[in-house]
Amino acid sequence: MSRSEILFANAQKHIPGGVNSPVRAFRSVGGTPLFFKHAEGAYVVDEDDKRYVDYVGSWGPMILGHSHPDVLDSVRRQLQHGLSYGAPTALETEMAELVCSLVPSMEMVRMVSSGTEATMSAIRLARGYTGRDSIIKFEGCYHGHSDSLLVKAGSGALTQGVPNSAGVPAAFAKHTLTLPFNDIDAVAECLAQVGKEVACIIVEPVAGNMNCVPPAPGFLEGLREQCDKHGVVLIFDEVMTGFRVALGGAQAHYGVTPDLTTFGKIIGGGMPVGCFGGKRAIMECIAPLGPVYQAGTLSGNPLAMAAGLTTLKLISRPGFHTELSDYTTRMLDGLQQRADAAGIPFVTTQAGAMFGLYFSGADDIVTFADVMASDSARFNRFFHLMLEGGVYLAPSAFEAGFTSIAHGDKELEITFAAAERAFAELKKA
């Protein structure tokens, strides 16, 4: 038995399913999940000492690559002063100032401890600000595991084939209206009927939890227009896209300004953290200034702030995001060429340093239906073949992939060699 098999068997004795987040269990792709013990640069190393080119990047935040020395040094320096105080620090103010300077739509920001907490708090804030109860989300978009958002969610929920979670009261779900992603006509029709009841629209500007589906031309602009028309708060969930699609996030890349924005662990260099922020008039509704309560003992914890400040400063250098995007384009072009040569129906999508891989004969992937029509069984086989070739992809056909600035020509060679073998094997099947 491999070390991962032994560790997984032991983990299942005391951890439900042997994992602390469902997608890690490999239920979608089959087999035993890998247990990792080390990561550096573009690579992760499992408990059997096998190295893999990593296209998961801890689900997005490792934009500098793993174990960047400057980030580690910043954490070591902070460690000498303590782990957490449960009190204000200069670091969190510096982080808030930096985030607001990089993302102009964010006039004020509140730190939290996860992306789920950020989206949950942003929705509560939108409800408190508007005095309305209903929210609109989109099919296949995942915004964390808070009760009101586990309705036709993407990510692990798609992987398991369960659109809703047990334990979510019907009274919660009835306030969540779910519409087709990239369908602005459906949004306009819905708001024409119930706009006075809707507090907010929350959207991933690039849907990163049904793999990677960029917005259709005019979709985000249409959301902004409809929200303005009906007095609805527009929330961009940029937990995945923030500081990755562009320095100012997807909102900068696509030129559409939301009212509120949520970010995740990238602002902590991969440590547990998140934040939400936006217009001052809305943010001043949060306690202690306003009636909307939100709190957290570890919010703005100094280790995450130290790591995040270093990360954001490093990715702010001119040309950083162009390099990231160029690598991603080269990688996807190479995969497409090899799939075409093998006669395998295959489509890729890209938004900056995010990407999607679909075994599909469609010309493009635009809707939730397009995603669900792709061949997930073939992806599962591809995943394991790539793993054998030393390439670690997300263990689900419905999760986006991520590149880092540490990926380069050597990693392309490994990726392309593994892909050639994988597509050849798929052709035989």
UniProtKB/Swiss-Prot annotation:
Give the EC number: 5.4.3.8
Cofactor dependence: pyridoxal 5'-phosphate
Q: A single Pfam family, by name?
A: Aminotran_3
Q: Which GO terms describe its cellular component?
A: cytoplasm
Single biological process term from Gene Ontology: protoporphyrinogen IX biosynthetic process
Broad class of enzyme this protein falls into: isomerase
What reaction gets catalysed by this protein? (S)-4-amino-5-oxopentanoate = 5-aminolevulinate
Q: Pathway, per UniProt?
A: Porphyrin-containing compound metabolism; protoporphyrin-IX biosynthesis; 5-aminolevulinate from L-glutamyl-tRNA(Glu): step 2/2
What UniProt keywords apply to this chain's record, in alphabetical order?
Cytoplasm, Isomerase, Porphyrin biosynthesis, Pyridoxal phosphate
* Subcellular compartments: Cytoplasm
> Which Gene3D superfamilies does the entry mention?
Aspartate Aminotransferase, domain 1, Type I PLP-dependent aspartate aminotransferase-like (Major domain)
- Residue positions, PTM N6-(pyridoxal phosphate)lysine: 265
Give a yes or no for keyword Cytoplasm in this entry: yes
- Write down the PROSITE patterns for this protein, in alphabetical order: AA_TRANSFER_CLASS_3
NCBIfam families according to UniProt? hemL, PRK00062.1
- Quote the protein name from its UniProt record: Glutamate-1-semialdehyde 2,1-aminomutase
Q: What is the lineage of its organism?
A: Bacteria, Pseudomonadati, Pseudomonadota, Gammaproteobacteria, Pseudomonadales
